[in-house]
Amino acid sequence: MIQMQTNLDVADNSGARRVMCIKVLGGSKRKYASVGDIIVVSIKEAIPRGRVKKGDVMKAVVVRTAKDIRRPDGSVIRFDKNAAVLVDNKKEPIGTRIFGPVPRELRAKNHMKIISLAPEVL
């Protein structure tokens, strides 16, 4: 459950390390984002010589949340930290690698490129 001002880790090699959510996309009154949703983020911490720099405003897809994700079979999955992958306006990842596991729910939201780059799909 991601809302405005939430800090997230970046799960790709775009050069950003930490980002902060500044808007949840998808309706004027929408407050929360979950796995697979697109948010607008501000880069708060970045490595030198990365593709992005501190202060940039970009879009990102939420790939891991500390809030549980309920599945239709009754099982629950949750992660230790909130994480996102930076994407461009065509919803393609900016980085070439994804770090850590991603949930199956990304497939239903049509983020196939992220799923194909991820080392593990839970």
Curated annotation (Swiss-Prot):
GO BP term (any one): translation
Domain of life: Bacteria
Record's keyword terms, sorted: Ribonucleoprotein, Ribosomal protein, RNA-binding, rRNA-binding
SUPFAM superfamilies xref list: Ribosomal protein L14
InterPro entries: Ribosomal_uL14, Ribosomal_uL14_bac-type, Ribosomal_uL14_CS, Ribosomal_uL14_sf
Residues of the signal peptide: none
Residue intervals passing through the bilayer: none
GO cellular component: a single term: cytosolic large ribosomal subunit
Gene Ontology MF, one: large ribosomal subunit rRNA binding
Family: Belongs to the universal ribosomal protein uL14 family.
Subunit comment: Part of the 50S ribosomal subunit. Forms a cluster with proteins L3 and L19. In the 70S ribosome, L14 and L19 interact and together make contacts with the 16S rRNA in bridges B5 and B8.
Role of this protein: Binds to 23S rRNA. Forms part of two intersubunit bridges in the 70S ribosome.
The protein's name: Large ribosomal subunit protein uL14
Species name: Mesorhizobium japonicum (strain LMG 29417 / CECT 9101 / MAFF 303099)
Source species taxonomy: Bacteria, Pseudomonadati, Pseudomonadota, Alphaproteobacteria, Hyphomicrobiales
Gene: rplN
